[in-house]
Every structure is written in C-alpha cells, then in structure tokens.
Amino acid sequence: MLQKVKDIYSESIQIQIAASSMLSENITNATQMVMQCLLGGNKVIACGVSRSYANAQFLVSNLLNRYDLVRPSFPSVLLSLESAVGSSLVFEQPPEELYCHQFNASAKSGDLLIAFAPLGTEKIVLNIISHAVSKEVNVIVLTGSNNDAIQGILADKDLEISIPATKESRILENHLFVINALCELVDQTLFPSA
C-alpha cells in the first residue's frame, strides 16, 4: 500500500509538471478575463456537475468570501441543483436544461461563466456553455484531455484550460490547483499592497 501512495504522488506530480509548461499562459489569460469581468461591474457564474460541482462551489466561496486576503466580496453565483430550486428544476426540465433557468435569470453581457467539465462529456455543462456562447457571455472551461465536444462549441474569445490527463481524480485535483492559482493572482493583482 505504501508503494501505491508513492505512485499516486508521482502520477500527480508528473501531471503538475506537464501542466505547468502547458497551462501557465492560459491561467494568466483566465486571470485577466476574471479581472476584466469584475472591474467591469459584472459577476462570475460557476457550474459543474458530480464531483466537479464541489470545485465550482469552492471557486464561488473564494470569490464571495476571500482567498488569502481579507477584501470586499467579488460578485459570483453558483448554478445549483440543491434545495427546492434544484428539486423543482429536476422535476420540470430535461436534464441537459437544468442550469438554463438560473443562468437566464442571472447572466448578462459582461458576465463570465466558469464551467468545470473534467470528462468533457457532461451534457448539463456542455449545454450551458452553448447557451452562454449564444448569449455572448464569455466562457472559461476547465477540462481534461478528452475535450473534443467542448472545443467544438467555444467561441474564439472563450478559453479552455485542459489538464493533460484522462483520469478524473487527477483532473479534479488539478482543477483545484487552477482555482487556487486564479484566486491568488486575482487577489494579488487587484490588492497588491494588502
């Protein structure tokens, strides 16, 4: 079992090394997109399904509350399937449409959708990305290597951060790294003296 733990660490580290050379520019560009959105008086809208929902929730928590710095809250919304709202949407909508009502009620030009699709096949997320593109809402999507369906729906102004991995657990932990890097860069850039 000890060797298996070491193998998991090694696998994770190798993906981090590959990602650092492949994704640094995309993370920088994503930071710029988030700051442009927030400085324009707009909001970040985040979504994910299954285990990536937790990453979307973590991003919104960091934006609303704080990352490292005590600072004003950044406007952000989590598209949610929880509570009575989620229950009524699940009951009355086709599965791929579950986020559309929430998105339509809150999204406006200048907002930014950050979507998590580690497998690249999550129909709910693919649908909301298409919806955002049609409404001309900018999109950042975090994926893994199996991302052909997503590449076909993004607009030129949108951004994909594709983790060089196919194993969902490694993709999710690297999405978490991207969230942390993004939040740290936004905080340090907008509040450099704090």
UniProtKB/Swiss-Prot annotation:
The cross-references to PROSITE patterns, in alphabetical order and at most eight, read: SIS
The record's GO molecular-function terms, alphabetically, read:
carbohydrate derivative binding
Superkingdom of origin: Bacteria
Q: Which GO terms describe its cellular component?
A: DnaA-DiaA complex
Enumerate the spans annotated as SIS domain: 34-192
GO biological process: one example: carbohydrate derivative metabolic process
Q: Please give the family membership noted in the entry.
A: Belongs to the SIS family. DiaA subfamily.
The protein in question is named: Uncharacterized protein HI_1657
